[in-house]
Amino acid sequence: VMVTVPRSGRSVADHLRSGRDWSLNTIRGGLFLSPYNDLKLVAPEKKAALLHHYYDNSIQFLKCSQSEYSVVMSTRNVGNIDLKALLRYHEERNSPVTAVYKRVDPASLIPENTILQLTAKGEATAVVPMSKAKISPKTKQVAKSMAIYLMSTVDLIELLQSANQRGDMISLEELMRQAVIQHNANAFEYTGFQANIHDINSYFAANMAVLDEANFRALFYSSRRIYTKVKNEIPTFFATGSQCRDSLCGTGGYIEGQLDHSVIFRDVLINRDSQVKNAIIMQGARIGAGCKLENVIIDKDAVIGPNLVLKGTSTTPLVISKGQHVFQQAEVAVHD
């Protein structure tokens, strides 16, 4: 598995480490981290050096992988896809590229999302941004691209080498979109839970959507389990008088207050008489006694003092940053 890390790869590397929690710390293969060359941050002299070498890291990884097929996946989509079923679908068809899509209401998409243009035979002829798509007001569903593409490794290497020769310096996702146009790709429909994360608001909405039991089971309790890092912590403790409704709680926490429709990460403390509703409380956060939190995201290791009111809206959650300490009401804005 090769992960292309963003501008600052520290948090990604800190989470993945050696890949042991996913059995990726093997002698052969395993986990590879590759820096992403963000051209907005690259000095002009380095851009010149990257010309004709922009995809070298990916090519080297693919050659060393010795795999017959490769899957290119964006990190903006949350889902639980059966890659074996995708491979079977690909092998039964003639096109060298298979693209994955999900049928969704066009009203749920933003201009930056992309959709597949499908033929009557179910082939994808293009990947079009919503901002440029011509969709009838009567259209109830469109084929939203999940930015997942499958190709033979040999074909993918050739695609990257050709891009190097041309001097292309665009994202791998954009290259795959061009491959769809060139080859009339196979189109594989994904029917499970899917959420698109492109900003803080969509991240908040995706977490709230997972609290729906049907979505939760579709994502986490299908035949394909999702694994995360093992901490070997004790279960979260719920004190006498605490209340918890429609919430997800990680391990190692201590809850004295009230939880309603919230996602609580590991090792979180919520003190007595506090009310937490429609919130995301990340690892190691501390919530003081008598607080009222609604439509908020509390980042890792943040501390909220007692008797404070933190309130955002369902479309614009209030965010407390990582490690921030808030002890005065004047430090935060309250949105009604």
Region locations from a protein language model:
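Left-handed beta-helix
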Residues: 154, 162-336
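Unchanged
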Residues: 1-208, 320
